[in-house]
Amino acid sequence: MKYWQAILFFLFGIAFANNLNIPWKACPNYKTYSGRRHYPATGPLRLPFQRPATSCRTFHSKSVEQTIEDVKEQLEDEDLARLFENCMPNTLDTTIRWHAADSHNPQTLVITGDIPAEWIRDSANQLLPYLPLAKSDSPLATLILGAIQTQAEMLIQFPYCNAFQPPKQSFLSGNDNGQSDRVTPAYDPAVVFECKYELDSLASFLKLSYTYWLYTKDQSIFTVKWLAAVERIIQVLEEQSSPSFDEKTGLPKDPVYTFLRNTDSGTETLGLAGRGFPLNANASLIRSAFRPSDDACVLQYFIPANAMMVVELSHLNQMLQASGHADIARTALVWANKIQKGIDQHGIVDHPKFGKVYAYEVDGYGSILFMDDANVPSLLSLPYLGFVERDDPVYVNTRKMILSSEGNPYYLKGKVISGIGGPHIGLRNVWPMSLIVQALTSDDDDEIMSLLDVLKHSTAGLGLMHESVDVSSFKSFTRPWFSWANSLFAELILDLLERKPHLLKKNAS
């Protein structure tokens, strides 16, 4: 970037802040703010109003504000209305760390919440509830397009990394993650916050891109930069479909990606000198070193991420065909079909109690990991991802397995909450995210209403979704500012108003 361009970016950032009338030094740290009750409180649970002051919000959207008012007017339950009012705008209110609204090259940095870095997966999911509004809200569309283009820049540089620092042109300082990771390919810590290779991160970029294009039909998404990011993703699929051993010599192959961290936690690093445990040839699946929880995979053919990639490669084929990029479109479809074949052959397995189910992880040798984790993509989320229908027989069996402590070691039960957790936090904590996904993938009215009741109480009176909560006490929780979970809750309410309005609407028959 030339000196004069840097000056323009700097001045634009100041202008953007001034346009929002943000007195930056006067705004409280939302990590602290979200952990305290603010008034007015409303509803039977007296849930507080947790949005920051208007002048402290990081982005304003008239269409989002109107949606909040429209939904509040429709909802019978005052507690759900307050939760939606807090959760729906949380990403816009608190996590738009930087936005350059250049009509030719918009850029947007979306942090996770209390961690001041952008995760590709989290940021994509944080923006999803706003996409249906983008066509009629030009500033919102520009914000989302900017997020897509910023993600593209990140992935072009370091496609194996999951979390990123503010872009150089934002003039924002980065943060040290406190680790001394040894990773190949090497990365630049000025650009990358963490470099865990997670297949679902790549799928999340494709999902955000497709969903934006689906709602807006905006052809400006197809930039040289965006197409280069897609080609980098295809390159990673090629590299990570390779087995651990050379099929001719039988010797171990040099892995493209390795990760080692000095840690006491087995879920934070990879075995065998950072390569992870062996994968067999001819599995037609893609390796993932880490899960969406940022925990290491045990068996690196991680089925939920492969399923998500099938869906998003099919979507990619659709949008590329429509935009005249037939060659890349065909490549995407070939990969989608190949991975689907691998899931059919290796991902559907026989469980001694639950019958034919989807495995969580496999290695192509016959090893199977039966479990599920709260983070999306998960086995529970397969219908939400668009991979199967809710009544798919294998999914129905899988759902019974993973919503049972007999079939899923991370299905946790306690005095106040039962649901799926995971190794990331430990064996006492359920993630509200898993209850939201359970409701999104359910057709049972009683089950959905029961889940909503638990979700209302899970906030410990703070009116926001938390990362995880102790099974015995809602007052013990992690991460009061976890924007992805707030966006997912908003998605659930919007979904139920459309799919099952009789459960939520006033005077519904």
From Swiss-Prot:
<dbReference type="GO" id="GO:0005783">
    <property type="term" value="C:endoplasmic reticulum"/>
</dbReference>
<feature type="transmembrane region" description="Helical">
    <location>
        <begin position="417"/>
        <end position="437"/>
    </location>
</feature>
<keyword id="KW-1133">Transmembrane helix</keyword>
<dbReference type="GO" id="GO:0005975">
    <property type="term" value="P:carbohydrate metabolic process"/>
</dbReference>
<feature type="transmembrane region" description="Helical">
    <location>
        <begin position="140"/>
        <end position="160"/>
    </location>
</feature>
<dbReference type="InterPro" id="IPR008928">
    <property type="entry name" value="6-hairpin_glycosidase_sf"/>
</dbReference>
<keyword id="KW-0472">Membrane</keyword>
<dbReference type="GO" id="GO:0004559">
    <property type="term" value="F:alpha-mannosidase activity"/>
</dbReference>
<dbReference type="Pfam" id="PF06824">
    <property type="entry name" value="Glyco_hydro_125"/>
</dbReference>
<protein>
    <recommendedName>
        <fullName>Meiotically up-regulated gene 157 protein</fullName>
    </recommendedName>
</protein>
<dbReference type="InterPro" id="IPR008313">
    <property type="entry name" value="GH125"/>
</dbReference>
<comment type="function">
    <text>Has a role in meiosis.</text>
</comment>
<dbReference type="InterPro" id="IPR012341">
    <property type="entry name" value="6hp_glycosidase-like_sf"/>
</dbReference>
<dbReference type="GO" id="GO:0051321">
    <property type="term" value="P:meiotic cell cycle"/>
</dbReference>
<keyword id="KW-0812">Transmembrane</keyword>
<keyword id="KW-0256">Endoplasmic reticulum</keyword>
<feature type="transmembrane region" description="Helical">
    <location>
        <begin position="4"/>
        <end position="24"/>
    </location>
</feature>
<keyword id="KW-0469">Meiosis</keyword>
<dbReference type="GO" id="GO:0005789">
    <property type="term" value="C:endoplasmic reticulum membrane"/>
</dbReference>
<feature type="transmembrane region" description="Helical">
    <location>
        <begin position="368"/>
        <end position="388"/>
    </location>
</feature>
<feature type="transmembrane region" description="Helical">
    <location>
        <begin position="296"/>
        <end position="316"/>
    </location>
</feature>
